[in-house]
Amino acid sequence: VINAAVVIQKGKILGVVPKTYLPNYKEFYEQRWFTSALQVSENSVRLCGQIVPMGNNLLFETAETTFGIEICEDLWATVPPSSSLALQGAEIIFNLSADDEGIGKHNYLCSLISQQSARCISGYVFSSSGFGESTTDVVFAGNGLIYENGYLLARSERFCLEEQLIINEIDVECIRAERRVNTTFAANKANCPGKEAIRISTEFVNSKDLNLTRTFNPHPFVPQGSELNSRC
């Protein structure tokens, strides 16, 4: 049994990404139930009548961008799977999580995502369990977070008792430009951890009704608010 994310488009399953690092400490005991991706020898699985690729090294390519997936605790690893995925072309990382709450943990989580998106020079979309999913053992705040290269773009309301959806735009062209000029990122490709990525091509159609919501500071080098005291 694996803990996995499934990518589906128009009724077709494109791939299955199993969780790599299973926490088995404190309130977590996932190794009792699940098998790590590191112990899965198969690279495909039959699911809903379809035989589809399976692995923690899947990259999903569209005409516009390439994305990869990791699951919850994977982000907490010393070398997260997303590091390898980013070095092999993933520009956006999605993390499906059941991250419970603890005192001070939210700030630590935000710091982790910020740092990982900065190290990978990527977008990072984090979605955790929330409304209606807390139990007598753990509490979920429903964290929804979108980061780009270390910067927060959008966040959901915590502990909301209704369903939520956050939307923002990740500047993929900016990510590509940053990677081109970052010689350390280029050099790291030669020492890329993890398995070679399996690339899955998929169609992507832009919505004609899409309205951009992201705004940009017209004076990025002029500090505002509390930054004024620290920088000037």
What does each model-found stretch correspond to?
Residues 1-232:
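Enzyme catalytic cores with a strong preference for nitrogen-chemistry domains
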